[in-house]
């Protein structure tokens, strides 16, 4: 999978300066989004922003919100804390949502000096617009997905 992704990145670099850009990696649960983003960040140089860090806090979990596709994502916070800062090329930080405490936790520093891989379900949600230079959707067959989820928990 990493070789295929590297070919995608190489093709992308032909139209964008080498070593920069925002790649959003969406896809099905357990398809390998986090693993691929982290491997590419190490291989090509870059940072990873995890959509899991933007879970919706309990106070905002209304029935209406939970019925929306992607309603479990605190997209307002992602829209203000991440998207406007991606194009700058400057380091920035945001606070990770800590599911064990159900509140904001540690501050995450994004170096933003190369590729930024935004990975996770709903990273390509329409509410975010076209903040990314490229979108990648990772799919997985049902059996492998089930096996990975069982092994994860």
Language-model features, listed with the residues they occupy:
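Extreme N-terminal, non-catalytic leader segments
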Residues: 1-23
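Active-site signature of alpha/beta-hydrolase-fold catalytic machinery across serine-
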Residues: 39
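Conserved lysine of the Walker
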Residues: 33
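Short beta-strand-centered segment that lines the nucleotide-binding/catalytic pocket of NTP-utilizing
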Residues: 44-59
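P-loop (Walker A) phosphate-binding loop of NTP-binding proteins
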Residues: 28
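Conserved nucleotide-sensing/catalytic segment adjacent to the nucleotide-binding pocket
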Residues: 47, 60-103, 115
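ATP-dependent NMP and nucleoside kinases share a basic, alpha-helical "lid"
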Residues: 103-152
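Hydrophobic positions on the alpha1 helix immediately C-terminal to the Walker A/P-loop
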Residues: 36
């Amino acid at each position: 999978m990493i070789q295929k992704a590297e070919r995608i990145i190489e093709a992308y670099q032909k139209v964008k300066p080498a070593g920069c850009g925002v790649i959003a990696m969406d896809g099905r649960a357990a398809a390998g989004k986090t693993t691929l983003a982290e491997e590419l960040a190490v291989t090509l140089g870059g940072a990873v922003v995890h959509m899991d860090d933007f879970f919706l806090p309990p106070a905002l979990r209304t029935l209406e919100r939970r019925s929306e596709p992607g309603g479990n994502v605190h997209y307002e916070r992602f829209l203000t804390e991440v998207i406007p800062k991606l194009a700058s090329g400057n380091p920035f930080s945001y606070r990770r949502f800590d599911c064990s405490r159900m509140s904001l936790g540690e501050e995450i520093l994004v170096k933003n000096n190369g590729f930024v891989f935004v990975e996770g379900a709903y990273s390509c949600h329409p509410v975010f617009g076209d903040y990314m230079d490229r979108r990648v959707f990772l799919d997985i067959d049902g059996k492998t997905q089930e096996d990975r989820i069982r092994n994860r928990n």
